[in-house]
Amino acid sequence: MRKITAPDLPATGLLDTHDRQREGVITERPPLAYPVALRALASCAATTARLLRQRRIHLPAGHVGTRLRFADGTSARVYRETVVDRGATKDPCVLVVEFRLRAVRGWGHAAFRWESLLNTPLFVGFPGFVSKLWLANDERGRYRGLYEWDGPRRAEDYARALWRVLALVSVPGSIHYTVLPGLRRDEVLARPPAMAGTAAADVPEWWRLTKVS
């Protein structure tokens, strides 16, 4: 597969083209403009409230404790899973997000893992959300989220909005995301090589899963 790149466009709004939804890795663009990101996050929070009332958000324990190893030599443990009841996923993709928190050391990581549940309204109500695996800090202090999304464009819209929130608490330059169209989360967990060969050689592979144990 070839790498999909985007033109140098200003971050003024949500994606308005289907050009970057073709087969291959969708690499990151700058975050959304603040007003656009805030509107998206507010809409997400409202949808999350409705999903909670309908009891459609769940925290299954099946993957908790699983260790995921990545192509950059790091690994991280799944400490939470979030899924939402929804219809069939028609255009699956995997989204991987990473960031490194500022000034968090030692017990601070445990505190973050506990309070991070309160961040659920920041993602579960976005259009196309299917599931999220929350990964603890790896050997380099980086956190990852491994998501399944319905629609690569929707996944990227979410990642670019989330960026604005993460930037408030993250080390500058540590926020990254990658979208992998055509893959399902359970597929890459069962067969990590499914992620291999999906990116050009010059794309850093912090996101590529190599082993699940």
Language-model features and meaning:
Residues 136-138, 179-183:
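A general secondary-structure junction signal
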Residues 94-99, 131-161:
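Short, well-ordered beta-strand segments in beta-rich or mixed alpha/beta enzyme
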Residues 167-181:
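Conserved short beta-strand edge segments in small beta-sheet-based binding/regulatory domains
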Residues 162-166:
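Short, non-transmembrane amphipathic alpha-helical segments
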